Amino acid sequence: MSLDRLIEKIEKTQNPSVAGLDPKLAYVPEYIKEKCFEKYGETLKGAAKALLEFNKGLIDALYDIVPAVKPQAAYYEMYGPAGVKALYKTQEYARSKGMYVITDGKRNDIGTTMEAYAAAHLGKVQVGSQTYEPFLGDALTVNGYQIGRAHV
């Protein structure tokens, strides 16, 4: 069972932490962005490749001391299909290192995450000096915050 694997990882690392992977392009070191933009241009693909490279470095540094990662889907969806592929590749890489992967895909999240979903599905995203419209929806359905014990 899935949770049994997580418990095993927690026991092995003696650490109940989860590393959140909420990679805003602004957080990615310049040398990674420059390398990816040189190869793929200031494109959604270039941005997504930069996120993936950054994540790989984090995973390499953490996999033997932290049992799990939690990539936030919104920050990948901001870069369209290339970003969704980077999410998949991040998950695949974390699993290859033996980590437990929790996809954070809640659509009724905090402000910064909602801004990322809005940019991905309704707005525009800046990559270097270029601006892109990752997905072409005219509207996006979301769940409102649900408060109370029944919703925890």
Where are these regions (language model features)?
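Short, well-ordered coil/turn segments that N-cap beta-strands
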Residues: 13-17, 64-67, 97-99, 135-138
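Glycine-rich, proline-tolerant flexible connector loops at the mouths of alpha/beta enzymes
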Residues: 47, 71-83
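Conserved small/polar residues in nucleotide/adenosyl-binding loops
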Residues: 19, 150-152
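Acidic (Asp/Glu)-rich catalytic clusters
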Residues: 59-66, 93-96, 151
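Conserved, mostly hydrophobic/aromatic
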Residues: 19, 69, 104, 140
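Short, acidic/polar
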Residues: 47-62, 113-130
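Alpha-helix-loop-beta-strand connector modules within alpha/beta enzyme cores
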Residues: 83-103
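N-terminal glycine-rich anion-binding loop in soluble enzyme alpha/beta folds
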Residues: 1-61
